[in-house]
Amino acid sequence: MALYRSDPYSIMDDQLFSNISIFDMDNDLYDMDKLLSSSTIQSDLEKIEDMESVFQDYDLEEDMKPEIRNIDCMWPAMSSCLTSGNGNGIESGNSAASSYSETGAVSLAMVSGSTNLYSAYQRSQTTDNTQSNQQHVVNSAENMPVIIKKELADLDYTVCQKRLRLSGGDKKSQIQDEVHLIPPGGSLLRKRNNQDIIRKSGELSGSDSIKYQRPDTPHSLTDEVAASEFRHNVDLRACVMGSNNISLTGNDSDVNYIKQISRELQNTGKDPLPVRYIPPINDVLDVLNQHSNSTGGQQQLNQQQLDEQQQAIDIATGRNTVDSPPTTGSDSDSDDGEPLNFDLRHHRTSKSGSNASITTNNNNSNNKNNKLKNNSNGMLHMMHITDHSYTRCNDMVDDGPNLETPSDSDEEIDVVSYTDKKLPTNPSCHLMGALQFQMAHKISIDHMKQKPRYNNFNLPYTPASSSPVKSVANSRYPSPSSTPYQNCSSASPSYSPLSVDSSNVSSSSSSSSSQSSFTTSSSNKGRKRSSLKDPGLLISSSSVYLPGVNNKVTHSSMMSKKSRGKKVVGTSSGNTSPISSGQDVDAMDRNWQRRSGGIATSTSSNSSVHRKDFVLGFDEADTIEKRNQHNDMERQRRIGLKNLFEALKKQIPTIRDKERAPKVNILREAAKLCIQLTQEEKELSMQRQLLSLQLKQRQDTLASYQMELNESRSVSG
């Protein structure tokens, strides 16, 4: 039997293989079957047809697993072939890609005529048809050459076959997975399907050409001892479709869903997604403007009632809420630039003044309405800033469970101004406006007025005759009572409760309330507060010419933290200028009306201001008296502490003769002196103990001597 090597150049001698390359991947290797026909493979073809009838229910185009399972993807060399043809396989030098062809090695029994006792495939061939085919191949082998393709030895497969033979099939399930493991480098691809086999089987039956012997293969189920289902540990769909998870040949439901979503996203003709409609703020403003225009007449009537109620509430609550004069064109600011707390006090005027302004100018009322709207918006914004305020009404604040905060409790004590009057937790809108007016005036006055610290005022001192602190008349540090801060042109002989204006907030840290004055400054542009005084009070202004007064008041003076008592204002000539109440009110009213364009009388203002000042005078008098008493006690404490430091300094030898010594140095030297005296005391105490011990010893010695002397006298006598 002539054996040919698998080298394509050694096979080209025959004209039948002149146009065929065995290792050409593009050509089907089984095209050789048209030229190579043999009667020895009839049994294998019949087995293949039988298996086709069994697996005809499977769709070959849908799933490739049945074909791969029943049709050989690889042709591993069997143990019988590997035993005898291992050397030839290594000589051939074929790589692992040789498993791509579907021609396996011929068994040892077919080549040499001998049988392998351990071959499972030789034991399984018991049919008569197979034996007759084998005998026909042996007899006709001399005439027709047999082409054998050799492969490299698969050591893993050889070991598995040996284990299977030696175990005798007892551990079939355990070795089955090892047998079907795909060796590294093995190919799962195939070059034909079952349809080609069925088509080519008819052509092979009638052709008479070179005999082609197929080797023993593991795909024949009846030839194997225990044929099992062919399974791989790799998903074979990756070899066909390029993915391990997606089946492109399945139903197109997912593809249809994706296409539908893509069309929906690419369709630009549809309306956008419906969302919650948010109207623009301009629509709301238009509605508010229409409503304000429709209710303009009612607001003019309500404005007059609001002013009357405000005046009554101000009189009852003891607050001075007289409006500041409107500014001129040069001093006016834009509505946007005005502070929100100014809007509440800017729209309130006297009854006659409001009537005149409404009848003469309708634009003023519209501006006031706009200011009210702006103020309400600002207050709503203020509601979200803090959780507690004295200046907000009840309906705008949600205090939750009404828990008492530290600012509501009685634990908050004002040391400077302790009084029995307490503000309500949530005042009404009118009280809120009054408080805002007062606080804004206080802040604006403090910032706008440039006042000297000490300026022409007297410091009356209440002598504390009952104080245990000794007098400091002989001290080098006299008290403020004996040394006023600055000489004044005229002094107040006595203290009068009604002589002090009541416009201060109770929590102010100044020792006496500052007298409010109607001031306008050419260098300071802004709004100034004006207040009306009682008859007999003095008015102080900054560069303001008043009718009926010949002299010009130089400037206003504010009370400092250490001042108390009645304020006296010096003029340029050094004399005071008392002005009557009527002249004062008329001058200010005329000034207001000249700037606002209205004409108002001062009769109603006079009566309301008088009532306010009388009520506020008695209330503030008690508060000022308590504040003065507290300041006196504090002053006495400071004087007593100063005297104690002076006495301590006299006891220290190192700084006794110094005229001035800081308190820190006095304390440091006193500490050193105390330590020195303590050490001296300890030394003296130890010395006393030693001396007492020596005295005791000497007394004992003296007593012993006396006893001896007495004994000697008694013996001699």
From Swiss-Prot:
GO cellular component: cytoplasm; histone locus body; nucleolus; nucleus; protein-containing complex
PROSITE patterns: BHLH
Keyword vocabulary terms for this entry: Activator, Cytoplasm, DNA-binding, Nucleus, Phosphoprotein, Transcription, Transcription regulation, Ubl conjugation
GO molecular function: DNA binding; DNA-binding transcription factor activity; DNA-binding transcription factor activity, RNA polymerase II-specific; protein dimerization activity; RNA polymerase II cis-regulatory region sequence-specific DNA binding; ubiquitin-specific protease binding
Region ranges (Disordered): 288-376, 462-535, 555-584
SMART domains: HLH (SM00353)
Post-translational modification, as annotated: Probably targeted for ubiquitination by the SFC ubiquitin ligase complex member ago, leading to its proteasomal degradation.
Induction notes from the record: Negatively regulated post-translationally by mei-P26 in a proteasome-dependent manner.
Biased composition regions of type Polar residues, renumbered to the chain: 351-360, 462-488
Record field: compositional bias (Low complexity): 298-311, 361-376, 489-523
Keyword Secreted belongs to the record: no
Database matches in Gene3D superfamilies: Helix-loop-helix DNA-binding domain (4.10.280.10)
Function: Participates in the regulation of gene transcription. Binds DNA in a non-specific manner, yet also specifically recognizes the core sequence CAC[GA]TG. Seems to activate the transcription of growth-related genes; required for cellular proliferation and growth. Functions in the TORC2-mediated regulation of cell growth, acting downstream of the TORC2 complex. Inhibits the demethylase activity of Lid. Activates transcription of mbm. Has a role in ribosome biogenesis and endoreplication in fat body cells by activating the transcription of LTV1.
Complex formation: Efficient DNA binding requires dimerization with another bHLH protein. Binds DNA as a heterodimer with Max. Interacts with ago. Interacts with lid. Part of a complex containing lid, Myc and ash2. Component of a complex with pont and rept. Interacts with puf. Interacts with wh/wuho; the interaction may be mediated by mei-P26 and may be involved in the regulation of ribosome biogenesis.
Protein name: Myc proto-oncogene protein
Organism listed in the record: Drosophila melanogaster (Fruit fly)
Gene: Myc
